[in-house]
Amino acid sequence: MNQLSAEMIKAGIVALAVFAGCAYDEPPPPAINVQQPAASLTGLLESVGARLSYRLDLPARHGKVPAVVIGHGSGRVTKDACRFLAAGFLARGFAALCYDKRGVGESTGEYSSVGPRNSDRMFEALGEDMAAGVRFLRSHDAIDEARIGLVGGSQAGWIIPVAAAKVKPAFMILLVGPTVSVGEEIFYSAIVEKTAAPLEDGYKRLPTVTGERGFDPRPLLETLDVPGLWLLGAKDRSIPTPETVMILDRLAAQGRPFSHVVFPEAGHDLSGSPYWEAIDRWLARTPTLGVALLGNTAVQRK
């Protein structure tokens, strides 16, 4: 058995730990004076093989409002895990839909940690859950069905393209979302996240990955015409940021409407980075979405 194969086996052994307890759960609290929702509605969403317990927070605005469906990172997470992202979008005039991950909290269905062998099946199911959220919002009287987006981080970076292919949202925002395969992410993080190895070691050795790759988002991303923003940390020890950027640049050169921002001092949690400012700038120049921010006094910088 060669050294690389041995490392891939080691990576497979730690895969459950990587995906069940990733350093990213959610970005830090938004740097805003957060308003409370004008209303919070709860209920159950029907998805394929699951019923999802949701909370829909609505802003204090007249008329139909834009909205986001917030997807989860790895682990057994509930709707409460997206509270900071929801608050940030609420302050920007968006409604925010959060839900318990399938098989977690009050949601039914199968929960499973994700690795290369089951990633295609699990991301199909989790993508269907996000798509169900979009379909629900499109039927809601308070929501502008033409301005519904998908938002999420880490593992959600794989799930969002699956959902986007199903329902064609108005936009997608992916925080520290990988564009490499599951197997490549595990290989990279096994080298640098669980050891003191320099990030450059992971970058240099990534092309030598062996073993199962599992889900790969690149074929889906090559087909998507959905405006997308990736927010990345240059010091991320979970996903290989340079490879992610290279893939996004290649896709943008092919005409995909994708942008990215790399924060030089940020890791996988984006802690200390001005990611909300980046989101604001991108939303303001994305057709039909910038209007959501106009005249919104809830967004006040500290």
Predicted features, each with a name:
Residues 27-61:
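N-terminal cap/lid segment of alpha/beta-hydrolase-fold proteins
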Residues 118-140:
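Alpha/beta-hydrolase active-site loop
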Residues 75-86, 101:
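The serine-hydrolase catalytic nucleophile loop
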Residues 266-302:
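Catalytic active-site module of serine/aspartate enzymes centered on a nucleophile-bearing elbow/loop
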Residues 90-110:
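Conserved alpha/beta-hydrolase
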Residues 166-204:
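Hydrolase active-site cap/lid region
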Residues 226, 240-250:
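Short alpha-helix in the alpha/beta-hydrolase fold that links the catalytic acid
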Residues 224, 230-232:
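Short beta-strand/loop motif that positions the catalytic acidic residue
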